[in-house]
Curated annotation (Swiss-Prot):
<keyword id="KW-0573">Peptidoglycan synthesis</keyword>
<keyword id="KW-0547">Nucleotide-binding</keyword>
<dbReference type="GO" id="GO:0071555">
    <property type="term" value="P:cell wall organization"/>
</dbReference>
<keyword id="KW-0961">Cell wall biogenesis/degradation</keyword>
<dbReference type="Pfam" id="PF08245">
    <property type="entry name" value="Mur_ligase_M"/>
</dbReference>
<dbReference type="GO" id="GO:0008360">
    <property type="term" value="P:regulation of cell shape"/>
</dbReference>
<dbReference type="InterPro" id="IPR004101">
    <property type="entry name" value="Mur_ligase_C"/>
</dbReference>
<feature type="binding site">
    <location>
        <begin position="121"/>
        <end position="127"/>
    </location>
    <ligand>
        <name>ATP</name>
    </ligand>
</feature>
<dbReference type="InterPro" id="IPR013221">
    <property type="entry name" value="Mur_ligase_cen"/>
</dbReference>
<keyword id="KW-0067">ATP-binding</keyword>
<dbReference type="GO" id="GO:0005524">
    <property type="term" value="F:ATP binding"/>
</dbReference>
<comment type="pathway">
    <text>Cell wall biogenesis; peptidoglycan biosynthesis.</text>
</comment>
<keyword id="KW-0436">Ligase</keyword>
<dbReference type="Pfam" id="PF02875">
    <property type="entry name" value="Mur_ligase_C"/>
</dbReference>
<dbReference type="GO" id="GO:0008763">
    <property type="term" value="F:UDP-N-acetylmuramate-L-alanine ligase activity"/>
</dbReference>
<dbReference type="InterPro" id="IPR036565">
    <property type="entry name" value="Mur-like_cat_sf"/>
</dbReference>
<dbReference type="GO" id="GO:0009252">
    <property type="term" value="P:peptidoglycan biosynthetic process"/>
</dbReference>
Amino acid sequence: MAELRTQPALGRIRQVHMVGIGGIGMSSIAEVLLNRGYDVTGSDLERSDVTERLEAEGATIHEGHAAEQVGTADVVVYSSAVDPDENPETREAERRRISLIPRAEMLGELIRMKFGVGVAGTHGKTTTTSMAGLVVAEGGFDPTVIVGGKVTAFGSNAITGEGDVLVIEADEYDRTFLRLTPSLAVITSIEEDHLDVYEDLAAIQASFTQYANSVPFFGAAILCLDDPNVQAIVGDVERRVVTYGTTRQAEVRGENVRREGMTTRFDVVVRGERLGTIELHVPGMHNVRNALAAVAVGQELEISFERVRDGLGTFTGVRRRFEKKGEVGGITVLDDYAHHPTEIEATLDAAHQGFPDRRVVAVFQPHMYSRTQNFMDEFACSFFNADMLVLTDVYGAREAPIEGVTGGRLAERAEQFGHRAVHYVPEKTDLPGRLQELVGPGDVVLMLGAGDIWRASEAFVELLENDGGTAIERD
């Protein structure tokens, strides 16, 4: 671990207690605070490899929640998964008048201390943040990077550098990204989502516009011109705008895209000047756009193209983003976080690029009842590029069930729209056995969803390994 800074920057705050510290977002903040010399304590419902890693770095972590675990904390930070009115630790903080803040507010404080690069968007945030972090690191800035997923090149979901640049994933859910004031505000895409929070697309666009306008006068909004809903807000952004994409009007443009298996190459043209070729070790046009956002960040920080190219060349993926879980008996099993129709279409496109001439079997666990209800028909049509679709029931997350909103109903709609190979497996635990009956050598099994479908992917790989890598021969 890097040498600790001995002068904390949060006033007289010395001890930070984090409720829900094991979550992907909270744990990255904890790493940064530990690196800056703070005394970090925390709690979560259960221990994990994440909490073990934080304890190895100096945190004190409790399993379960109890009022006394707040201890002598100067501030208590709570996860978005925690109800502050119900949790005993947040209620204890209120009783004792200890500062009690949500995760997003702590992120805002961290970004205030540095030159912030915020990456927002309905799709592509995690990958783009990771790519931008690698570019900034290769540029010699020794950045701090906070990502909503474990990055293969980091070995973690955070880099705790000693430099003055902070690259951070900015989440639009519950408008939390409006607490951030980055110097560079990236917007990768805008689409209808989180309709439990936003009234409609116009409200989502207004929120992203406010985010873009939060940058200081010396900063810039970096916008993807390939996205029609981002195009629509360009005229409302009151700060300097830098555009990127594959369209001819983008200032940072990708051209001559060559897609060969798991490798994607494209040429970079910046304001009419051809700089050279980028080679990515991940498939999909969506990753070309993600990389172009990182190129634009590099341009703003005056990082040489060679450094940008080398930084992107080290990117090999993020956990649960087209992650290979195993290959047994000629069956390849992948896991991906895609949980929106547009993301599903992009991931299926990447699968066919990465594994040409192979059958792609999509296994989808819908995430949240409201999202499934709002996008039922869009989901049903998003799987036409899958040779076979296997559906299980909805992962409710924070929501109660909605009558008539099930994986079975989605399966019916997919068939009604014309998909010719749809299977419904209500119980997720039954997926491994059913998949063993449905797939065979040469198939690519792509598990999709933001819930716990990854458990089924691991169980399926284990089942194949235990059975000697064989699937049941299909007709």
